């Protein structure tokens, strides 16, 4: 889900 792209770490 691109909304959570900031969590991709």
From Swiss-Prot:
An example Gene Ontology CC term for this record: extracellular region
Subcellular location as annotated: Secreted
UniProt keyword annotation of Disulfide bond present: no
Modified residues (Phenylalanine amide): 9
Keywords, alphabetical: Amidation, Neuropeptide, Secreted
Any Gene Ontology biological process: neuropeptide signaling pathway
Origin: domain of life: Eukaryota
Family indicated by similarity: Belongs to the FARP (FMRFamide related peptide) family.
Official protein name in the record: FMRFamide-14
Organism: Sarcophaga bullata
